[in-house]
Each structure stands twice: as C-alpha cells, then as structure tokens.
Amino acid sequence: MDYQYFEEESDYIDLDEEEEDDDVVTAGSLDHRFGQPNGEEDYYFGGDDVEEELVVDGHGVLELAGRLLESLQSCVQPSVLQVMQYVAPMLLLCLLCRLLCLLYSQRRRLTSLAPLHLFHFACGLIILQITVGYRLLLLLLLAAVGYLLLQLLRLGRRGAQVLAVLTVGSQFLYELLIWRRRSDWPQLRGIQMVVNMKLISLGFDLTASGQLQARIPGPFAYLGYIYSPATCALGPWVSFGCYMDCLVPRNSWLVSLRRLLPNVVICVLAVTVSNCVAPALSDFFGDSSHFLVMYWDALSVRSSHYFVGMMAQALLVASDQRLDGATKESDMLGPLISQPWRIEWPRSISSLVRSWNIPMHEWLKRYIYAPCKPTASTSRGRILVVVLSTYLVSSLLHGMDLRIYLVLISLAFLAEGESLLRRQLASLLNACITANLCPGKERCRYSHCPSKRRLNSLSYWLARLTNLAFTALAIFHLAYLGVVLLGDDLEVGEDGDSFLWHWQQAGYLSHYIGLGTFVLYLFIS
Amino acid sequence: MWKIHNKLLIYILWIMEIRLVSSFTSVMLCGRIPGLTPGQRNMCREMPDALIALGEGHQLGAQECQHQFRGHRWNCSEVWQRNVFAHVIPTASREAAYTYAIASAGAAYAVTAACARGNISTCGCDVRHKATPTGGGTPDEPWKWGGCSADVDFGMRYARRFMDARELERDSRTLMNLHNNRAGRTLVKKMLRTDCKCHGVSGSCVMKTCWKSLPPFRLVGDRLMLKYQKAKTVQAVKGKRGLRLVLSRKKHAGTARAQKPVLDWPKRMELIYLEASPNYCERSLQTGSQGTSGRTCQRTGHGPQSCDLLCCGRGHNTQHIRRTTQCRCQFRWCCEVKCDECDESYEEFTCK
C-alpha cells in the first residue's frame, strides 16, 4: 500500500497564480479553530528570556573535543583526496618527462637539444592545463610578451635593467587589464611571478659582462625553460644555466624514488595541518588567548607554504632538477626549497627569512642585493637601504597585494633592527648572541661561546637564555605577521581594514617592539 | 507495559549490527515499530540501515526541543515519548510548529551525517563534487572539487519522504505540518558550511581544496527558536487546487469600506501555526497540555521559569531538603578510601 501525501506543487503556494475568486470562503467546516493569540500568551512569550546557562565544565570540554574531532573528520578526508588529485598528475608528468629525456639522450648522441626542450615544454603545458584550465592561453600570451621583452638584451646591461623594470611593471599591468575577471588572477599570480623571476635572471645572466655575451636562447629553449614541468606550476625559480645542466637526468631512479616518499608524506601532513588542524585549534582557543589564535592562524599560513614547498621539492626530485647553490641539498629530501625546522624554531628573524624560500633568497641575493652592495667600506645606513630595496623588490614581484607589502616591509624593519641590536650586544658583552649562527669552537671570535664554555659555566647558560629569548620573540613576530596573510586577498577591497584586525587587537605590538629595537640600538652605540 | 515494550524495541534496534539490521529489520522489526505509517514501513523495508540514522535524528530533535523549552510552561515533554517515531500534538499551535520543524531538521541532519560517516550503504560521496579527469571544466566552475562532502541532498530527500509520509489527511493541519517540516530541513541545508583553502606560490591560489561540514545541531535549534518566536498565524482558504494557507490578517473594526482582501503567503522559511496556544497551566488531554503542577521553579529570578509565571499564579510549595554527601575523599595505603561526611541543605520550590 503506497502512502498518500500531497504532490509537490500543491504543498506550497505558487507565487505566479492569482486568485480570481472574489468570494474567499473561510473554511468553517474545518475541525481546527484559528484566531489571534490572547493577551496572556503575549505576556508569557514576550517576557524576559535571559537565562543563565549552567554549563558544566567537564561537559563543555567534552562537547568541544567532540566538535573538534567531528570537524577534523569531515575536513581531512576531502583535503587529502583533493590534494592527491593535484599531486599525482604532476608527479607522473615529471617522471614521464624525465623518462623521455633519458631515452632520447641514450639513443642518439645529443645532436640537438631541441627535443629535450620540447619534452619539457609539452609536459609543462599538460601540467598547467590540468591546474589552471583555460587560463593557460593567458599564460602563453604573457610568455610571448616576455620573449619579445627578451630582445632588449641586445642593448647590453642597460637592456637587462630595462627588461627587469618592464617585467615587474607588466605584472601590475596584467592585474589591471584583467581587473574585471580578477578572480582569475590569484591562480595565475604565483605562476607568473616565477616566470618573471626567470626572465629577469636570464637577462642579467646573459649580460653579466656588460654586453650580450651569448646568443639569446631560441624559442624552444626559452619555452622549455619557462614551462619546465618541475618548476612551472609551483616554482621554484631556477637559473637558465641550472636548467641546461639538468636537461639530461643523472641520478638513479632508486635515489629519486627514495626521496619522493618523504616529500609526499610531508605534503599530506602539511595540508592536513593547514586545512584542518590549525583552524580547529584556532577555534578551540578562540575565547582564551588572542596570541594563540594568531599563532594557529599563522601556522595555517605557514603549513600551506610548507605544503607547496614540499610538493615543489617532490617535483624537483621526480624531474631530477637541481637548484642553484647546490650546498643545500638534503640526502633524504633532495633539493630544499624551505626548511620548516628553522622556521618553526628560528634563531632570528633573518635566519627564518632565509629559510622561508631558499631559491627566492638566492635570486634576491644574486640579482638585487649583490649588485647594489658596494664592496669598500660599507656603512650601516647604506646596508639598511640595500636591505630595504631588496625587500621592496620582493614585494613588487608579488604584484598588487597590499598585505604582502605590509608584511614584507615590516619584516625588513624587524629583521634588520634585531640584527643590528644583536651584533652590538655581542660586541659589548663579548658573547655569541648574534643573529647568525656562530661557527665552531675554534673559529668563534667571542669569549662567551656556548661551544667554548662547558655546561656548568654561567656564561654558557646566559648566552643560551638570551638566544632563547630572541627565539621566543621571533616566534611572536612570526605569528603576528603571518596571520595577516590568512584568507583571500580579494577581501581587501570589500573590507578595507579587515586584515588589520589582528594587528589592532594585538595593539601593533610587533611594530612597537621593532621600534624599540632600533631605539635601543641607537642608545647603545 | 507500553513503555517497556517500546524500550525493548529501542534496545533491540540499537544493539544490532548493520548486517543483522539489514536482514532482520526488513522482515520483522519494520512491522513492529509503533508509530510508523504504512508508507514509512515501506521505506523502512527499502532502506533499513537509514532507520538507525532516523532514530538518532529523532533523539536529536527530542533532546534539542526539551533543551530549548526547558523552564517554559510547555517543556516539550510527553510529546516524544508516546511513540517511537511519531510526535503528536493535538493543537495546531506554535509549539506544534516548532516540534515538527525540529523533528524534520533532526532527521535530515542525522541522515546527512550518517552518509558522511559511511553508515548508509546506498548513499555515497556527493558526486557533484567529484573531480573530473580533465581540469578544464567550464568557466562557471573554475575549481575542481573532490573527496567526500556531506551529501546533504540525500539527507534532504530521505528526510522529506519519511517525515512527510506521516501526513495521511488532506486538511489544513497537514498543510501546516508539511510546511514546517520543509522549513526545518531546509534550515539544515542552509546552515551547511563550505570551507576552502588556497595553496600556491607565495600565497597565491594555484590549488584550492574545499569541503563541507555540518554545524552543531544546537545552532539549528537556536535558529529555529528564533523562528518560533516569529511564527506566523495562518488560515486555510479554498483555492483552485484545493486548500491553501494564507497569512491571517488583523481586522480593522474602524474601516467602513469592505476592501478586497489581499492574500499573503507565508514565506518558505517561516514557521506557521493555525491555532492560538493554550496557556498550558492546567492538564488537558484535548490540548496536549501537561500542566505545570509539580514543576520546579525559581523563586528569585525573572523569565519563564520564575514561580510567578510558571505556576500561573497558583503559588508554590517550599521544601527544605537536607542531605548528607561524601566529600574530601582520600586514598589511604593500602587499600581503602576514606571520605568525610558533609551536610548540605537547600530549598526547592515546586508549583502547586
């Protein structure tokens, strides 16, 4: 026997239908009465509803823990599955590109490098097609513009500088041109940033001696370099020379597979922390401590960065692509893009800045900091200006994102102030409390070094405690600056001051600490 | 006797594993659970493992209703205990509107959560969020979705079929119940949260991961409580295709001209009721009122739980209670626990 209930359309009123009957027959024959609520009911329900909820603490904590586990459970599985759907095609295409290059290099005697570039370009195109879809056409258009800009290198060193200015400026131009569809830009911004860094580095490398000392790469080499599968989607920057050196893979497959596994595992852990664990802990401590909310939200930003870095490391390992400055290669993980252990427990702000993105740090040091730094009798003010210029260029590379500018310029002031203060304190107290790590026992030029003194010495523990205090301060700065980067940058236009809310809640404490650091440094010296 | 029978059935229902329920429930238990209509029994035989989720949803609604109406004259008792899967309120009142909405919301909530946990075999991941092999897609949907999101549409459909199957008549009360059922389960769907996270170079958005999650059911109850306080009075009028409910209008006695009445429909998310609520002071079987005699009230305080309001002016009894409890227990080696005895006394107020 089928149950009977009203059909879909008769359940609710159709708004389009107009009642034509003038005589509205009130259904008097119905068995239900209707009327107005009586006065007593109004007084009863309109009364004061403020009630004190006697929440038992144990029950509250258990409920919160249950809610935490439930939110984790509904978040971890979709996140890991979606991330695997991104990671697996990228890894397979990198391995395919490596296999094709290996077969080609073994088969013939390298009469031409063009097929190798084509393999890189084709696999990179497929990766970008999978990742960004139809926006790939926009990326190819920007690559063509970049190749035209590359012809400026015929002018020599000045052409390279003009190329750099035009490349960074065109980043802003792209954002303004597609402002109508600016929801597309956050997906392309990271990819185009790496392309711009490659263009600028190529320009400066080819004109290192002042003139164009080598031929401009052909279209195939250019496209293979720009859209190499290991670096096209998630970075990092590699120089053209490093790319050419690694066209033919050299490491054995066993080494690469052994390095792939820890990278993928850390990828999954990092995305779990970024998507699920850190926001859940931020909600958990939402009412107790504002610093803990800032810390967990900033940890969500940092673990997202670790996830991208580890994934890019996995792509580098799969492609057997090495990074510039080969001293920072780990035997377990391969080429290192970031060092999370030095970021989560930093010795100083400058050390964590160097560990954040090692290839980008290499790029900034090689093309911005080193040319601007004079060799003879460098003054303090000049170094400060050069450091600020380096941070400013790093901000400009990120395009039109005000939060990046605020965070990076603040980071520049905090890092430089801390470095100056610690160097001055180290000279005064003759102890190893500088921002950089002191060398070993023999080479340490201070008398109070942890490596020189024994464990029972007082100066050993004083130096350790001072460094520990600076580490705690750096952790606070990390939470303070990182929390601003949480959330979409498109929200800046809608709520003008929303991303500064955390800084206002903290009373701009990090900025005042940075100012106090400079004042203390000027007072001491 | 009747309650013992119900508890035995509930106990049997909860203690069985899914396999036993799948084979045994469809033959025996679906026919024995009281309160089910024939249509609901057919749905129980079709999908017996969803019945456990509906039982959980039933309890969710019952506990939430009793929590929200604690301290009120009508405290949502006796309504849920009469039958296992039924809730009957004779009066088409505002409280009935809340009861039907919270029951429907609980059913939709529990079935959706059971789908996400994988406890119901015929519903899986939300297929609309499956990732396609090619990442191109249409420009309208730029982000690739994957993984298991809460399949809320299955919960909505199943809860609607099950809860609406109770309405066998075609009168105004049925229309009211169907409307409030829909308001309750649609609220659960509206309160679903979609969280997304961007990952990319330097904070860009090369990759995006999204997931959906159910809010705590307490939030659903709180939201429905706001709608309960703003519930609308409706009346039944005869239309072209049968009865329909329109908002009741206040009559202006001073208006001499009899203008053409303009009919207003209740909004989809509003709770509606047909009759004014009784005062719930006296016990009455016709109105489903239990009365407030014997209820615990607060002498000092304001609000619906105060003795003046809760006892309807009949006064209250004061009972001095003195009891002895064990406190400051200590473990002594070896091996006994010794406690002190503490006396405490307090006053308890109950309505006359």
Swiss-Prot record, chain A:
One Gene Ontology cellular component: endoplasmic reticulum membrane
InterPro entries: LPLAT_7/PORCN-like, MBOAT_fam
Entry keywords, A to Z: Acyltransferase, Endoplasmic reticulum, Membrane, Transferase, Transmembrane, Transmembrane helix, Wnt signaling pathway
Record EC number: 2.3.1.250
An MF annotation (GO) of this entry: Wnt-protein binding
Catalysed reaction equations from the record: [Wnt protein]-L-serine + (9Z)-hexadecenoyl-CoA = [Wnt protein]-O-(9Z)-hexadecenoyl-L-serine + CoA
Membrane topology: Multi-pass membrane protein
Active site: H398
GO biological process: lipid modification; peptide hormone processing; protein localization; protein maturation; regulation of Wnt signaling pathway; Wnt protein secretion; Wnt signaling pathway
Keyword Transmembrane helix appears in the UniProt entry: yes
Subunit composition and interactions: Interacts with wg and Wnt5.
Protein family membership: Belongs to the membrane-bound acyltransferase family. Porcupine subfamily.
The protein's name in its UniProt record: Protein-serine O-palmitoleoyltransferase porcupine
Organism: Drosophila melanogaster
Record lineage: Eukaryota, Metazoa, Ecdysozoa, Arthropoda, Hexapoda
UniProtKB/Swiss-Prot annotation, chain B:
O-palmitoleoyl serine lipid sites: S202
CDD domains: Wnt_Wnt7
GO biological process: axon extension; canonical Wnt signaling pathway; cell fate commitment; germ-line stem-cell niche homeostasis; muscle organ development; neuron differentiation; open tracheal system development; positive regulation of JNK cascade
Stretch forming the signal peptide: 1-23
Subcellular location field: Secreted, Extracellular space, Extracellular matrix
Protein name: Protein Wnt-2
Organism: Drosophila melanogaster (Fruit fly)
Alphabetized UniProt keyword annotations: Developmental protein, Disulfide bond, Extracellular matrix, Glycoprotein, Lipoprotein, Secreted, Segmentation polarity protein, Signal, Wnt signaling pathway
Short name of one Pfam family: wnt
PTM comment text: Palmitoleoylated by porcupine. The lipid group functions as a sorting signal, targeting the ligand to polarized vesicles that transport Wnt2 to unique sites at the cell surface. Depalmitoleoylated by notum, leading to inhibit Wnt signaling pathway.
Glycosylation sites per record: N75, N119
Principal place of residence: secreted
SMART domains cross-referenced by the UniProt entry: WNT1
Tissue expression as described in the entry: Dynamic expression pattern during embryogenesis. Expression is predominantly segmented, with expression also seen in the limb primordia and presumptive gonads. In embryonic tracheal cells, expression is close to and dorsal to the tracheal placode.
Purpose of the protein: Binds as a ligand to a family of frizzled seven-transmembrane receptors and acts through a cascade of genes on the nucleus. Segment polarity protein. May function in gonadogenesis and limb development. Wg and Wnt2 have a role in the developing trachea and together are responsible for all dorsal trunk formation.
GO cellular component, one term: extracellular space
Record-linked PROSITE patterns: WNT1
Keyword Ribosomal protein applies: no
Family stated for the protein in its record: Belongs to the Wnt family.
Molecular functions per Gene Ontology: cytokine activity; frizzled binding; signaling receptor binding
Intrachain S-S bonds: C65-C76, C115-C123, C125-C148, C196-C210, C198-C205, C281-C312, C297-C307, C311-C351, C327-C342, C329-C339, C334-C335
